[in-house]
Amino acid sequence: MIRVLAVLISVVFLAACNGAADLNKAPVPLGDFNLVHNIAVAPKAVKGPLSREVSKAQLTKALTDATEERFGRYNGSRDYHFGMSIEGYVLAQPGIPVVFAPKSILIINLTVWDDAKNVKLTEKPHQITVFESLDQGPVVGSGYTKSAEEQLKNLSQNAAKAIESYLVKMNKEKGWFRGNGAPAAVVADTDA
């Protein structure tokens, strides 16, 4: 009985870990948000030890595609821009099943701009580190089960989900995407 319960919990946990798992649902509330420019660069991207090789163009395209896939669902009236810099990555190679299953990692820096105010919302770039989803081959490793492109797509989708989570947090804490883009306290003052 305990084993069955553990398996069920594991399945639910694995499903929840994929950055693209919720794309078929309505987007999480993010205020009056519309992404206009979605720019990724990789001038200093560091390939981690034992990583598979991908080009900088592949890195940036995967991240911009995943970001568009997630944020293209928002259609608010206020425009915002993302500047994303890929700082490092590891695309896991095949390991030794069960004993050593390397994991893939992506590290990015995010800058968010408010178009109407022409200001940067992130005082300094916000760093995000994501790992591959656990459904990518937790026992044998994604190096055996996925191509480098598939690993990169998964990491990029996880990064886009992490960006969304960060923006939801900042909107709640600082009111980044409220009706007029001002923090909640300022909105209350201007409505009076």
Where are these regions (language model features)?
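Short secondary-structure boundary motifs at beta->alpha junctions and helix caps
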Residues: 47-53, 119-162
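A structural "domain/chain start" motif
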Residues: 17-61, 172-192
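Sec-dependent bacterial lipoprotein signal peptides
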Residues: 1-18
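Surface-exposed short loop/turn segments
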Residues: 75-122, 133-145
